[in-house]
């Protein structure tokens, strides 16, 4: 049986304050669907977060209907679970748009309920369009979905009830415990328990590609849901890292693992992560900002960025706020226009900011305190010598500031957990602390630079 596996499509995701088109996400999804049709796949798995929000807007619903309709017309069975973005609350009984698609006969939605005695594994019934599992092509597909903080406990309950004489494919929207906070991740011992009863574990939730041996896989997000995810295109050694979707073949009689498993990359909008040292411009009384913009345009042109590219520009060096006041939003727009690229985002987290201005003077000049706050965080981080992020204090300081801003904006716990879990800094800390799977092949993660 040939299967395609995607996760974290996030149709409707708003990126760079709406400057990037949401059609990027649909195009990536459509590309993989067309590949599945071309290669005559029999099953198409969606391991959660087809949509970015529980409240789906009509254009994004139409995107899903159109692409899923192509799969249906080609006779490919789509089997899906819901992720944390697909429904408002884990235990909510409110109808979801994933249910709507199931009622429209565009996918089979699997859900497992739990009570005090454990998992309730009911077969999927066409009359109810509901159930925890279904048999198809000699395989038994089981949908665990997103289980939140109780993931380890509930997954063990579920797999303990799986029949040993069946070849199981388990769909789970979760990641390893060193990436997922709030106790919602699985450990290497959890994976061993799952592997004892499962031929293939189809994962989602963490947006970078991960693989455990030859039987468990998270293919990563199809498109960059955040520009920073472009760093996931390379591994820790700097080698290209396939990311986007998984293709596998399972022989039902061979229950231990798939016959073949590959993670493949799909086309996505190019992102260039570039660094510019601002020190030469930081003390210029006149034309400092103009010189900085020109230098940024020069390095973008040197990178031969195409017109459809996004530039993730990181500024470093020392910048004297008494001499040059830089508005990152205005600078990004000006750089974008002069470099003739699709979008530019300017990250000030790596700047060493010098200023003798007081808070009142900063306010009077219309300057944000962001640069000064990051500098203060950086000073504390440098003094602490945090294990695993040596020489990355600036990145860690920027991450702490962004997390503080997310809390200030009252983002949900799930959104904060995703923000923390998607940071490549956690991968560095995890590697330094040997926080990798102790049994089998280590889970492979991202590099710090994009390809």
What are the residue ranges of the model-derived segments?
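Accessory, non-catalytic peripheral segments of nucleic-acid enzymes
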Residues: 256-451
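Glycine-rich phosphate-binding loop signature in dinucleotide/nucleotide-binding domains
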Residues: 38-40, 163-165, 303-306
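Short loop/turn segments immediately following beta-strands, especially the blade-tip
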Residues: 251-254
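N-terminal active-site segment of His-dependent metallophosphoesterases
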Residues: 1-67, 73, 441, 445
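A structural signal for the main folded, soluble domain(s) of proteins
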Residues: 30, 158-159, 223, 393-397
């Amino acid at each position: 049986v040939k299967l395609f596996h995607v996760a974290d499509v996030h149709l409707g995701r708003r990126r760079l304050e709406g400057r990037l088109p949401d059609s990027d996400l649909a195009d990536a999804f459509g590309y993989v669907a067309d590949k599945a049709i071309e290669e005559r796949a029999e099953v198409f798995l969606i391991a959660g977060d087809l949509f970015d929000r529980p409240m789906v807007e009509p254009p994004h619903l139409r995107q899903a209907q159109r692409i899923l309709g192509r799969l249906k017309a080609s006779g490919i069975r789509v089997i899906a679970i819901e992720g944390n973005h697909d429904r408002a609350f884990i235990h909510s009984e409110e109808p979801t748009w994933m249910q709507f698609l199931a009622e429209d006969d565009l996918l089979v939605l699997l859900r497992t309920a739990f009570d005090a005695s454990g998992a309730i594994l009911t077969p999927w019934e066409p009359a109810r369009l509901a159930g925890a599992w279904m048999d198809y092509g000699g395989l038994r597909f089981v949908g665990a979905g997103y289980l939140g903080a109780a993931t380890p406990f509930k997954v063990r309950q579920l797999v303990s009830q799986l029949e040993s004489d069946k070849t199981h494919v388990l769909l789970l929207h979760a990641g390893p415990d060193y990436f997922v906070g709030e106790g919602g991740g699985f450990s290497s011992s959890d994976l061993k328990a799952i592997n004892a009863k499962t031929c293939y574990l189809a994962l989602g939730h963490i947006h970078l590609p991960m693989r455990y041996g030859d039987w468990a896989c998270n293919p990563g997000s199809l498109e960059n849901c955040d520009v920073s995810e472009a760093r996931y295109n390379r591994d820790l050694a700097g080698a290209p890292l396939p990311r986007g979707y998984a293709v596998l073949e399972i022989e039902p009689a061979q229950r231990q693992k798939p016959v073949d498993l590959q993670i493949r990359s799909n086309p996505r909008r190019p992102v260039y992560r570039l660094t510019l040292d601002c020190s030469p411009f930081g003390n210029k009384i006149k034309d400092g900002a103009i010189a900085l913009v020109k230098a940024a345009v020069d390095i973008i042109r040197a990178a031969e960025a195409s017109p459809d590219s996004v530039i993730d520009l990181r500024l470093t060096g020392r910048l004297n706020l008494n001499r040059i006041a830089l508005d990152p939003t205005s600078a990004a727009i000006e750089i974008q226009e002069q470099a003739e690229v699709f979008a530019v985002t300017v990250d000030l987290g790596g700047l060493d900011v010098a200023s003798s201005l007081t808070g009142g003077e900063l306010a009077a000049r219309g300057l944000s305190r962001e640069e000064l706050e990051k500098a203060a965080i950086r000073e504390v981080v440098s003094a602490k010598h945090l294990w695993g992020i040596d020489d990355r204090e600036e990145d860690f300081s920027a991450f702490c500031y962004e997390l503080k801003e997310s809390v200030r904006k009252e983002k949900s716990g799930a959104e904060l957990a995703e923000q923390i879990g998607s940071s490549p800094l956690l991968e560095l800390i995890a590697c330094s602390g040997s926080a990798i799977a102790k049994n089998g092949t280590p889970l492979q993660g991202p590099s710090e630079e994009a390809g």
